């Protein structure tokens, strides 16, 4: 007799498969959870007072071996560039929702209890409108390219409970385009940790 595989939130009996039927397609569906960030050079996951950062709410969809964000959280990245909380909030509001996809290669473990993910993130590109420095001045548009790499910690999906965890590192920020493109030297590399639970399963 096989043991039922449980998924979080809104899954139902139709979504349950016996272990010998499990494959990487069980990852497909909707996810909700938290994203926390920290400077790579600092203590991982800890704030100045030594407590874990609360993180921000995130949601994503997995389909066709792609983690798809329709509202990727960019405030921490913007804040690291402009160094001003109010200005960062203005820019994030002006940019609006940011779509970002992360492709991956899934590998089902021999025990069929989890799926490892080899992430292949692409650069995140934004067009940021900087408010005018003086009253009556013109706002300036700035092209920002954020270099992203897979984190050192393993990414994976737990089949028993539908929990998804992965890390990506924001390693470099390039400003401008063409001949004017240059690295933003004041940027501090950061690690973004995503911890999400599957709340809907897609049937491919």
Q: Where are the regions that the model predicts?
A:
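Edge/loop elements at the starts and ends of beta-strands within beta-rich repeat scaffolds
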Residues: 24-28, 157-162
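A short, surface-exposed beta-strand/turn
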Residues: 47-60, 85-111, 186-203
């Amino acid at each position: 007799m096989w043991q039922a595989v449980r998924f979080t939130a809104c899954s139902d009996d139709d979504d349950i498969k016996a272990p010998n039927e499990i494959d990487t397609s069980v990852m497909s569906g909707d996810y909700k959870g938290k994203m926390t960030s920290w400077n790579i050079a600092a203590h991982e996951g800890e704030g100045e007072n030594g407590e874990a950062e609360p993180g921000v709410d995130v949601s994503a969809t997995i389909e066709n071996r792609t983690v798809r964000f329709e509202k990727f959280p960019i405030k921490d990245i913007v804040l690291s560039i402009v160094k001003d909380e109010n200005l960062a909030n203005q820019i994030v509001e002006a940019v609006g929702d940011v779509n970002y996809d992360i492709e991956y290669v899934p590998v089902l473990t021999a025990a069929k209890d989890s799926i490892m993910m080899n992430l292949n993130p692409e650069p995140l590109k934004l067009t940021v409108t900087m408010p005018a420095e003086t009253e009556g001045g013109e706002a300036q548009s700035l092209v920002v390219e954020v270099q992203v790499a897979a984190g050192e910690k393993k990414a994976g999906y737990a089949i028993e409970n539908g929990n998804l965890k992965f890390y990506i590192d924001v390693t470099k920020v390039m400003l401008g385009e063409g001949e004017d493109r240059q690295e933003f030297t004041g940027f501090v590399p950061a690690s973004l940790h995503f911890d999400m639970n599957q709340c809907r399963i897609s049937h491919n």
